[in-house]
Amino acid sequence: MRLVIARCSVDYVGRLKAHLPLATRLLLVKADGSVLVHSDGGSYKPLNWMSPPASLRVSTPDEVDLELGVTEQWTVQSAKTDDRLIINIHEQLHDTSHELGQDPGLIKDGVEADLQRLLADQIERLGTGFSLIRREYFTAIGPVDILARDADGATVAIELKRRGDIDGVEQLTRYLELLNRDPLLAPVRGIFAAQQIKPQAKVLANDRGIDCVTLDYDAMRGVDDSESRLF
């Protein structure tokens, strides 16, 4: 992991265009090829980023940029699309690299991990014709619990929680923003699934076009035998 604090401007060029004017920012260059641009606000969400696979090329700026104070130019090129992240660095304030090694990954709450496994095996609970793409679909901002396809072949990102609240909806929203930038997956819609979903979370999910599904954990485990009940 390389961490650079620099005065820089940033341009995203491709299917979308975005510009960040000159300011001091944190640049994260990860071993998987992803590059993320952070400010001192906005919580953990980057201002802009390039997802892996991608390549980073550092070059000397042209005469025009040199006159504007640019000392070096980073071009982060996506390997899948023509999208590029262009970072014009005016001054480096800090530059350090650390070998983090293999990360064991997020260890989920026991019930959440079991819900993920069970839903992957019973993906048809989300609707007729659903099929599993994979569990733990990794992105530059974290793993999507389950990626699936619906009966129409459209991509669906599923976020699983034991108790669904607003934070879970916000997390899924960030995943959807990122996944919909990938032409191989887009359009991607979201499903927020949990044993219990708070009313505020349902309202926010509905406002953002995200479906909510309440999961019966006991039934999924096969222990909810209604025929054996006395009452």
UniProtKB/Swiss-Prot annotation:
Q: Highest taxon of the source?
A: Bacteria
One GO MF annotation is:
DNA binding
Database matches in Pfam families: NucS_C, NucS_N
Q: Name one GO cellular component term.
A: cytoplasm
What InterPro entries has UniProt attached to this entry?
Endonuclease_NucS, NucS_C, NucS_N, NucS_N_sf, tRNA_endonuc-like_dom_sf
Locations listed in the record: Cytoplasm
The main location is cytoplasm
Protein role: Cleaves both 3' and 5' ssDNA extremities of branched DNA structures.
Classification via NCBIfam families: PRK03298.1
PANTHER family noted in UniProt: ENDONUCLEASE NUCS
Return the HAMAP family for the record: NucS (MF_00722)
Q: Give the protein's recorded name.
A: Endonuclease NucS
Give the species this sequence originates from: Arthrobacter sp. (strain FB24)
Task: Write the gene name.
Answer: nucS
